[in-house]
Amino acid sequence: MQLSDFSFDLPKSLISFHPYFIRSTCRLMVMYGHTGMIFHKRFFNIIDEINSGDLIILNNTQVIPARFFGKKESGGKVEVLVEKILGINNILASIKNSKNINIGSKIFFGYKDKIKGSVVDCKNSFFEIFFHDNIDSAIDIINNIGEIPLPPYIKRFRNKLDVDLYQTVYKKKTGSIAAPTAGLHFDLPLLEALHNKGVDIDYITLHIGSGTFQPIRRVQIEEHIMHSESVEVSSSVIQKIKSCKKKGGRIIAVGTSTLRALESAYRSSKWSDSKDFISDTNIFIYPGYKHNIVDALITNFHFPESTLIMLVCSFLGYKNTMNAYNTAIVNKYSFFSYGDAMYITHNKLAPYENFII
């Protein structure tokens, strides 16, 4: 398929630049994959779509304050965006204004430039930085000097609401530079109501990297190579999925990152033995892919021509997805990270859809 097949015109007025103050009050579009029927609700109504005995799986990654600033030895300012924490003292990061930065270069951070970092390696467009601090770890340093990086399309200044509302209420494991945005709509009362209904809830971890915002630069989408991200799916989650399906329950993934984590685990040798899956994944899911685990997906409305809308098309069907997005635009749903949500069920015929546009 061509990249242009996933293009659509989105009025700027439908891009949400601010979060919902009450998470679960955002709008919810429900679409059933096998019929294409659409219903308009509020997110707290999602409890009506999920049954006792179903299993919801969420991504418990926590966004780190991954953006901070420093000075080169020459005095020039740089902006650092952490891609991954590599160890106690090492990070992998992109650096703006990186001219003349090479292996061995020194960068100074923090109050009065007291924190020294050295560039010890260059990997593609990323730099590995070693912090010389003998007291604080890399994550401690980042927590002290960094700020939460909002998506690049949000140009306004960050505020106190962002610090809280650009994290999920169930965050646990630090490592993402972007929030798993489908999970932002869940608040504690909704999670409690689902639990009281008999819905099982469990977690995976996929640390979202900067690649989630990178555009596809190929005309034919099959030529695109996905960025790599760290993922953990525990043996207990794998066992719980198998047990749920055996009893006739459904697996509901919250977010494309959760779905990608589960499919990555399924395709590994760990799945059949129900062993912990801890690895990196660059799985690219696009139309034609046969889904193996997830029965329903909760997700936001995504960018045109993004890998995320391609995943949705693979799950819901191309024609269903484009119809849903057109309907969302007509009905003035909010788009992107702080926008509204979809609850979609798997269309088992999607892999066999006629892709002649």
From Swiss-Prot:
Main location: cytoplasm
UniProt cross-references to SUPFAM superfamilies, sorted A to Z: QueA-like
Cell location: Cytoplasm
GO cellular component labels: cytoplasm
Keywords from the UniProt entry: Cytoplasm, Queuosine biosynthesis, S-adenosyl-L-methionine, Transferase
GO biological process: queuosine biosynthetic process; tRNA wobble guanine modification
One Gene Ontology MF term: S-adenosylmethionine:tRNA ribosyltransferase-isomerase activity
InterPro entries: QueA, QueA_dom1, QueA_dom2, QueA_sf
Pathway stated in the Swiss-Prot or TrEMBL entry: tRNA modification; tRNA-queuosine biosynthesis
Pfam families assigned: Queuosine_synth
EC number of this enzyme: 2.4.99.17
The reaction(s) this protein catalyses: 7-aminomethyl-7-carbaguanosine(34) in tRNA + S-adenosyl-L-methionine = epoxyqueuosine(34) in tRNA + adenine + L-methionine + 2 H(+)
PANTHER family per record: S-ADENOSYLMETHIONINE:TRNA RIBOSYLTRANSFERASE-ISOMERASE (PTHR30307:SF0)
Assembly: Monomer.
Summary of the function given for this chain in its UniProt record: Transfers and isomerizes the ribose moiety from AdoMet to the 7-aminomethyl group of 7-deazaguanine (preQ1-tRNA) to give epoxyqueuosine (oQ-tRNA).
Family the UniProt entry places it in: Belongs to the QueA family.
HAMAP family documented for this protein: QueA (MF_00113)
Name assigned to this protein: S-adenosylmethionine:tRNA ribosyltransferase-isomerase
